[in-house]
From Swiss-Prot:
This is Aminopeptidase N. Substrate binds at E120, G252, A253, M254, E255, N256. It comes from Lactococcus lactis subsp. cremoris (Streptococcus cremoris). The active site is at E289. One of its GO terms (molecular function) is alanyl aminopeptidase activity. It is found in: Cytoplasm. One of its GO terms (biological process) is proteolysis. It catalyses: Release of an N-terminal amino acid, Xaa-|-Yaa- from a peptide, amide or arylamide. Xaa is preferably Ala, but may be most amino acids including Pro (slow action). When a terminal hydrophobic residue is followed by a prolyl residue, the two may be released as an intact Xaa-Pro dipeptide. Coiled coil: none annotated. CDD domains: M1_APN-Q_like (cd09601).
Length: 846
């Protein structure tokens, strides 16, 4: 049922908010006055978990009704027009990282608490009565009093104006949506700097971390703001930009205007323990949130069905920004590895959501944050659009968009209009097929009787209903003489031989630089030509060959055995991008390989041979001056070499562990997870698991925590696994924000999978209570869908989750997971014998 839009009866202009918060009792006392235009004599405001003592309108006490089911308070004001409605109420801090909530941490054994906020998507109503809809923009005058102790500070969207008897009064905000209001208070340390234009930038964290961990995020934040001000040709509109790392945080980060909050692992970088990958990850997260300060905050989607306007764009701009700031990182390679790969896999399942999807009820909003679609696919579409328009027109169109719609709300067509006005191209016509339709096409390229035939149809992994969808496909070819777009089902280009001669006889490939959202099925001589030139191709094209052939095999268009046969073509590759593509393909092939089988021995041998040259080249030790690509590649090479049972690698891993066993954090960060994993696999020691868990609890290094949790999940000891699962109930050991990741590490390993699955089913009610509404909640639906591969597990999954299909927040994820498991089971059944044979044959020949 469609939810009511409360802005239709009341349009807010200003909120005056006073909050008195007591950390010890976890109680909130609130006073809020909302000034705006009443369009009816009875108006409603969003409120959830608020207990009202008094409501006034036109300075007179008035009647009200609390409607818990619709999360509303209905107020009878008696007349229409401009009015101030005031509320006095009480509430409690939440325990699910939504609304106003506590974050817990320790410093030198002393337990401490921060208070922070998370109001996106519709959780401002848990803190104060409001029109909690993105279109209902207003200004906010915030005042906060709390049980202040020595060393405490408070930060918010705007600078603090004054402090009166412990009441912190902040400057009025600019006009913005309710979900962007934020504040954090507690004992925080910080470092500050300024941009060239004078914006004050600060990085904040608890004293559980070294101050040095603030240097990298502060530098990236300053340079990112400077980049965006120049690229957007629009000044950053606030006096400051605060970046706060919170010990407990539901998602990765939140773009609160001027007061951005982060999960600690997404912001802090310890210079003594940081890998190049962790730096790149943190930098792109910060750049993503800062992109939102314009696209999402200054200009905001009108309703949640255009959430992609926020997330797709910011996900694209984080790479544009980092490519400009750190060109040696080659971040577009990372884009292909992560975003493109994620989008292509998820978007190939029938029933997947489109980028733009109708939202009728707030409970559905959580399903929109599908990272593979709204973030990854959406950003891939923005990359495609930027290439089609050219960067100059793309940037100029954005500048026009911000100028035209600043402090307002938009729909997707408003962006297309601005880009079209600058470029002269029909952007809406080009983009609608991509944004409004689910899925993507496979473009088949073949030569028949000297005619090149290019055709498109929707690509499915697993069963899918072909509805005849067509896309405006940018061919982005390396040849001249071909059309720019494939908009029809098929195009035929005669005179192929002459066309090839005109292009110097080089092999034809499409989708240059992997910038458009489709894959290619090269038939016959076209594939043979491409593979014959593989060594001279660009790295991204080599990656695409691996990517596309893997997906075609996954869909049953070709056999995985055919994919195994092309692996020897990639034994000499030194590129991080190509070797990552190789690693991803190997992970897919592991589905077919039974543990402790003859095929596994052959597969291990094959993997070892594929990575042997890079193992000899890179070894275990970082070399001064080596490229970011080599530093990133080392971990992949070592992991695959150890999988191959290479004796030298296993000996060296054990030696490194022995050297650092008294201080595991001192293992060089780029090889640390490899060493930690190997020691558990080699010893299968319950005592070592205990050591890892004790280290996990004590360390404040968030990346190190992840590594330790991944390593302990490799244990093959039923008693220890049961203890690990039981520890998820203790927030002093595993924080609620980390349960999903820790549990998945156990679920994905064959030995512990049954126990992890049984634990989920037995603890579903408590998970729902603890994490319901949290962005990690549906991971407990999605992760089994990404993992299970047998008919028995499919039946168990359906038996457990099909009764939960009425839950709108989980419905799509359940349906998608069932289709994914079904397809995986069918794939293994149909191709296992051929794949096993191909692995054995190639391993002997290589």
């Amino acid at each position: 049922m469609a939810v009511k839009r409360l802005i239709e009866t009341f349009v807010p202009e200003n909120y005056k908010i006073f909050l008195d918060i007591d950390r010890k009792t976890k109680k909130i006392k609130g006073q809020v006055a909302i000034t705006g235009e009443a369009k009816d004599t009875v108006v409603a405001f969003h409120a959830k978990g608020l207990h009202f003592n008094k409501v006034r309108a036109f300075s007179v006490d008035t009647n009200f009704i609390e409607n818990e089911e619709d999360e509303e308070i209905v107020v009878k004001i008696g007349e229409t027009g401009r009015v101030t409605v005031s509320f006095e109420y009480e509430a409690e801090l939440t325990d699910n990282m939504m609304g106003i909530y506590p974050s817990y941490y320790e410093v030198n054994g002393e337990k401490k608490m921060l208070i922070g906020t998370q109001f996106e998507s519709h959780f401002a109503r848990q803190a104060f009565p409001s029109i909690d809809e993105p279109e209902a923009k207003a200004t906010f005058d915030l005042s906060v009093k709390f049980d202040e102790e020595e060393g405490d500070i408070i930060v918010s969207n705007m600078p603090e104006l004054l402090n009166i008897n412990g009441i912190h009064v902040f400057e009025r905000t600019v006009k913005m949506s309710s979900y962007l209001l934020a504040f954090v208070f507690g004992e925080l340390q910080y470092k500050k700097g300024k941009t060239k234009s004078g914006v004050e930038v600060g990085a904040f964290a608890t004293k559980a971390h070294s101050q040095a961990a603030l240097d990298f995020p502060l530098d990236i934040a300053i340079r990112s703001i400077e980049f965006y001000e120049d690229y957007y040709q629009t000044p950053y509109p606030l006096p400051h930009s605060w970046h706060i790392a919170l010990p407990d945080f539901s998602s990765g980060a939140m773009e609160n205007w001027g007061c951005i909050t982060y999960r600690e692992v997404c912001m802090l970088v310890d210079p003594e323990n940081a890998t190049i990958q962790s730096k790149q990850y943190v930098a792109t997260v910060i750049a993503h949130e800062l992109a939102h300060q314009w696209f999402g905050d200054l200009v905001t989607m009108q309703w949640w069905d255009d959430l992609w306007l926020n997330e797709s764009f910011a996900n694209n701009m984080e790479y544009v920004c980092m490519d400009a700031l750190e060109p040696s990182w080659n971040v577009w390679e990372s884009f292909s590895i992560s975003e493109a790969n994620m989008a292509l896999n998820r978007d190939a399942t029938d029933g997947v959501q489109s980028v733009h999807v109708e939202v009728t009820h707030p409970d559905e909003i959580g399903t929109l944050f599908d990272p593979a679609i709204v973030y990854a696919k959406g950003s891939r579409l923005m990359v495609m659009l930027r290439k089609w328009l050219g960067d100059e027109d793309f940037a100029a169109g954005l500048a026009l968009y911000f100028k035209r719609h600043q402090y307002g709300n938009t729909v997707g067509d408003n962006l297309w209009d601005a880009l079209a006005e600058v470029s002269g191209k029909d952007v809406a016509a080009f983009m609608h097929s991509w944004v409004n339709q689910p899925g993507y096409p496979v473009v088949t390229a073949e030569v028949v009787d000297d005619t090149l035939i290019l055709s498109q149809k929707q690509f499915f992994v697993g069963e899918g209903v072909d509805k005849g969808r067509l896309w405006n496909v940018p061919l982005n070819t390396n040849w001249t003489g071909l059309p720019d777009l494939l908009s029809s089902e098929k195009v035929e280009i005669p005179g192929f031989a002459a066309l090839k001669t005109k292009n110097n006889g080089k092999a034809l490939f499409l989708n240059d630089a992997n910038m458009a959202h489709y894959i290619i099925d090269y038939k016959g001589a076209l594939l043979t030509d491409l593979l014959s030139e593989v060594e001279s191709l660009e790295n991204v094209t080599k990656f695409q060959i691996l990517q596309d052939r893997k997906l075609l095999a996954k869909a049953g268009v070709i056999s995985y055995a055919d994919v195994v046969n092309i692996l020897p073509s990639f034994t000499n590759e030194e590129s991080y991008l190509v070797n990552t593509g190789l690693s991803q393909l190997i992970s897919e092939l592991e589905l077919f390989v039974d543990e402790d089988s003859e095929t596994e021995k052959a597969f291990q041998s094959l993997v070892g041979k594929l990575f042997a040259k890079n193992y000899a080249r890179l070894g275990w030790d970082k070399v001064a001056g080596e490229s970011a690509g080599d530093e990133s590649l080392r971990g992949i090479v070592l992991s695959k070499t150890l999988y191959s049972e290479n004796a030298d690698a296993k000996t060296k891993a054990s030696q490194i562990f022995a050297t650092h066993k008294e201080n595991l954090a001192s293992i060089p960060a780029d090889i640390r997870p490899i060493v930690l994993n190997n020691e558990i696999k080699t010893t299968n020691s319950a005592e070592l698991v205990k050591t890892y868990r004790e280290t996990y609890i004590k360390t404040s290094l968030q990346e190190f925590k992840r590594e330790l949790e991944g390593a302990v999940a490799l244990i093959k000891d039923e008693k220890v696994i049961a203890e690990l699962l039981e520890s998820f109930k203790n927030a002093d050991i595993v924080k609620p924000q980390d349960i999903a990741f820790s549990w998945f590490y156990l679920l994905r390993n064959d030995f512990s999978q049954d126990a992890a699955w049984a634990w989920e089913k037995a603890n579903w009610a408590s998970l729902e209570e603890k994490l319901g509404g949290d962005m990690s909640y549906d991971k407990f639906v999605i992760y089994p869908g990404n993992t299970f591969k047998t008919a028995d597990k499919l039946a168990e999954y359906k038996a457990f989750f099909e009764p939960k299909l009425e839950n709108q927040g989980l419905k799509r994820s359940i349906e998608m997971a069932i289709k994914q498991i079904t397809a995986r089971v069918a794939l293994i059944d149909s191709q296992k014998a051929a794949v096993d044979k191909a692995i054995t044959d190639i391993a002997e020949k290589l």
